[in-house]
């Protein structure tokens, strides 16, 4: 399975920042996109970005969709944070929501799966699954969703959007929802290490050392080696 991750906007995108200028949306989007990529890939899901997420230039929506359509991706997910008002002052608009293309049953299924995880993990107001004429959901060949992870024009939510722990929760919620849609069980990172080779314990090391010393002493006593020093 393959997921195309779209991190919305870039450094040169006009506006798209909190009223106090401490948060630019593209920075939040890219952080979550990278963590989403990590979590999907550790579950064996192939991923790609819809554009170079290190560039300062905002890649056009048509280019993003063209890349996704040529990639053979099974799911397209666009990462965003929301805004309300004129952007110059804090407003009361708040909450989490997700957009799909009208009539997309698969898009609806993905959105509901992500919504379930997000509302549980993030503690934000549930604004629900919505349909709108968004370019990226309407011009991609695969099921597509656009996620708004909270409002950077809302003072309290902006503080959350700047917090790395909250961003990680966003990525985990998105990943859990996508994986649920794909029929892949979520694995906590600690669970992944259960089957990792264990380091020899100190007792085992002492046991091996003692055995080696005994062997060396026996070889010396038999005259096989004369220059072995066993302390």
Tell where the protein language model's regions lie, with residue ranges.
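Sec-exported extracytoplasmic/periplasmic mature domains
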Residues: 34-45, 69-73, 115-123, 175, ...
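Active-site-adjacent mobile loop/cap segments within catalytic or ligand-binding domains
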Residues: 4, 10-17, 71, 75-78, ...
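Short Gly/Pro-enriched loop/turn and capping motifs at secondary-structure junctions
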Residues: 104-106, 134-136, 151-154, 200, ...
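Active-site-adjacent substrate-binding region
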Residues: 106-130
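Short, charged, low-complexity patches
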Residues: 25, 29, 107, 111, ...
């Amino acid at each position: 399975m393959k997921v195309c991750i779209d991190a919305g906007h870039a450094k040169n995108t006009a506006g798209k920042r909190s009223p106090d200028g401490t948060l630019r949306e593209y920075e939040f989007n890219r952080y979550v996109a990278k963590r989403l990529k990590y979590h999907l890939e550790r579950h064996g899901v192939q991923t790609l970005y819809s554009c170079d997420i290190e560039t300062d230039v905002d890649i056009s929506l048509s280019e993003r969709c063209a890349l996704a359509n040529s990639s053979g991706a099974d799911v397209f997910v666009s990462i965003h944070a929301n805004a309300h008002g004129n952007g110059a002052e804090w407003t009361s608009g708040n909450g989490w929501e997700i957009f799909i293309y009208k009539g997309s049953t698969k898009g609806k299924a993905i959105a509901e799966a992500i919504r379930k995880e997000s509302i549980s993990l993030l503690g934000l107001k549930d604004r629900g699954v919505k349909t709108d004429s968004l370019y990226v959901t309407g011009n991609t060949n695969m099921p597509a969703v656009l996620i708004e992870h909270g409002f950077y024009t809302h003072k309290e939510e902006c503080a959350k959007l700047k917090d790395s722990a909250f961003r990680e929760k966003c990525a985990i919620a998105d990943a859990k929802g996508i994986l649920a849609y794909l029929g892949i069980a979520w694995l906590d990172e600690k669970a992944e290490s259960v089957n990792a080779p264990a380091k020899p314990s100190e007792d085992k090391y002492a046991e091996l050392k003692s055995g080696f010393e005994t062997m060396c002493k026996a070889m010396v006593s038999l005259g096989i080696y004369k220059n072995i020093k066993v302390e």
